[in-house]
Amino acid sequence: MTDFVAHRNGRPATAEELAPLAFAGYAHFTAMQVRGRRVRGLDLHLERLRYASIELFGRALPDDRVRDYLRAAVAAGPADVSLTATIYSPAGEFTVAGADVEPEVLVRTGPAASGPTGPLALAT
């Protein structure tokens, strides 16, 4: 059996924790392919998450904490997965969030994706 996960802040997420996120929409994400439990360009993904968090929430979580959350999700499943890391406000989109509301992290893994086998051509 292959285990894929949905983790919130480094631990398995419950349906109750995920429900507000499904309807809030106040979030940003990055998606990556994990091969052999490694990610190419992880530093670029972390940079993207950091800058987008500052733009959206006025603050960012430490890279080490986000990296720990990613590592926990990757360790819980197969060595090759597709991974999406979503940074969101637990207060939601339609509420006034104070400066003390810290963004949270949802990490979801799924089956590894493979790109196209041959060259691509753009249609005009």
Question: Where are each of the predicted segments found?
Answer:
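Conserved alpha/beta cores of soluble small-molecule-handling proteins
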Residues: 1-124
